[in-house]
Amino acid sequence: SRLVEPYLDGYATSNVTTQIGTHAYLPCRVKQLGNKSVSWIRLRDGHILTVDRAVFIADQRFLAIKQPDKYWTLQIKYVQARDAGSYECQVSTEPKVSARVQLQVVVPHHHHHH
């Protein structure tokens, strides 16, 4: 039955705005995961960042956190301007299920140097 398939809450792109130097948390809600893997992909270069708890990027700032309510959250520590852009979480079903998060990075006003 379809009920045991993993599914994502909300197919629309989420938007997250984070200040430079702070931590970003990109949400991907997955329910009834079973034995399916959840991957986070950085769309600008197609780099697979995480699969479940495993991290596949040398950058120590990236971490996937599984929340008690079955959210898989991608944490990016000390966000930099180049982190801005689209990220996608994918569930390893056939066909795969995916949801996108758009990360916007802003500079806090008191850090401006004129």
List PLM regions with ranges.
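Extended interaction regions within the primary functional domain
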Residues: 4, 50, 81, 106-110
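Conserved strand-loop elements at the edges of beta-sheets that form or border functional pockets
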Residues: 10, 18-20, 32, 42, ...
